[in-house]
Amino acid sequence: NSHLILSVFLESYMFSAVALIVFLLLIQQEEKPLAHLVPAGLFSFGITMTNFIQTCILFFITTPRIKTIFKYVLSVLILAVFLAFIQDSLYPSSDPFYRPLSYSQEQDYRFNLFEAQPQSVGGRANALARSMLMFSVVAPQPLILLEETGCSFPCSMVYYFDKDGVYRISSYEGFGKGLVFGWLILLATAGWLFFKNFRVAPKAFALSTALALTMLFNFTLHMNYGDDFMLYSPDWTYALVFFFGISYESFSEKKWAQSMLLIFLLGLMINNLNLFRELLNAVLPFYG
């Protein structure tokens, strides 16, 4: 659902997903020239450095050549520093990434796991897990908030952190509840198929392993950083969708599997478009 919303804006979050998908496709080619991989890595680095780390995970797991990976990382970093230096020369007000002061504001988005209350840590883990595995695919009922978050205009969220340090998380109702239940069954089956095949031929499923590790990386990262998971969802949803598709690759020619997936996708479209109806109904009285 966040992709439908963010895709209508010129936002770096959507380009973030594009950069990762491009890199993912490049490393699947038989020939992996650095002349192609470095620009893709630089593109992802320019959007967010954490996504560059994802490219390193994908590269290392699928192509475990230390020397090649070292050249890739070094080339991207040298080019990134050079381009950032040029930008700083042309626009002195910019904050290049190699200056420690440029990260001072990031402290505002940090979540300290060691200082937070246990209920806050557990609530954040629950909200993040739901955002990654459920909300990024099947839209829940949005929370329409006003005084709860100090909004004078309806604020739509899928979770919020209240004054008592408790995460209030949106849920599913009616058709959406059945749809997300079906999605979780399909996702659990995809995970089972992955582990089953990985035990037999781990090298053949290196890409699925890399995708799973990038999702784990994102979970670890955002347990410690970020205040709105929806904004970062493109950074892990691409991995979730590719992991899901690869797991069911052996069923791709089965008519019954194609029919089931088509029915699920139609249901997903209906459910996720309902999110926009809920949002429009919430703001309509303010334009009456």
Go through the PLM ranges and name each one.
Residues I66-L90:
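Hydrophobic alpha-helical membrane-interfacial segments at the cytosolic entry of transmembrane helices
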Residues S252-L273:
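Signature aromatic-anchored transmembrane alpha helix within multi-pass, membrane-resident enzymes
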Residues Y109-F194, L211:
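Lumenal/periplasmic acceptor-binding loop at the mouth of the active site in multi-pass
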Residues V22-L24, I53-R65, P234-Y238:
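Hydrophobic transmembrane alpha-helices of multi-pass, membrane-embedded glycosylation machinery
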Residues P202-L221:
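Transmembrane alpha-helix segments characteristic
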Residues N1-V18:
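Aromatic- and kink-enriched transmembrane "portal" helix at the membrane-lumen/periplasm boundary
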Residues F15-L34, A239-F243:
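Specific aromatic-rich, kink-prone transmembrane helix
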Residues P33-P64, S75-L79, I263-L265:
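Membrane-interface alpha helices of multi-pass inner-membrane proteins
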